[in-house]
Amino acid sequence: MSAKNNTWVLITGASGGFGEEFARQYAAQGKSLILVARQFSKLDALARELRQHFKVDVMVEQVDLSVMSEVSDLHHRLQELDIQVDILINNAGYGLQVSVQQEPY
């Protein structure tokens, strides 16, 4: 994986839906990808497909974005690899655990 001189796109919620489609679109443009979601198996399958079809660099990061220590760990891994995120697709969903009336805003 070559960190320098690439445009890196970090996509959260990349294991399906809009996130998966964003990954396909950016891979088709030759961008390097960092796919982030909680479901590793789906990310890994998508990454293998994109690498094979588009010949792009793809990192897979299993991260629960509601856990700050996991977000921090991701940040440190990217720093260690000298990867700078150029484009962020902040697509991860947040499901309400309570009714809207009970949700503290």
Please tell me what each predicted stretch does.
Residues 26:
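Aromatic pocket-lining residues of Rossmann-like dinucleotide-binding sites
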Residues 16, 93-96:
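Flexible cofactor-recognition loop at the NAD(P)H-binding site
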Residues 1-10:
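Flexible N-terminal pre-Rossmann segment of NAD(P)-dependent oxidoreductases
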Residues 8, 15-17:
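Conserved glycine-rich cofactor-binding loop
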Residues 95-105:
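Conserved mid-core segment of classical short-chain dehydrogenase/reductases
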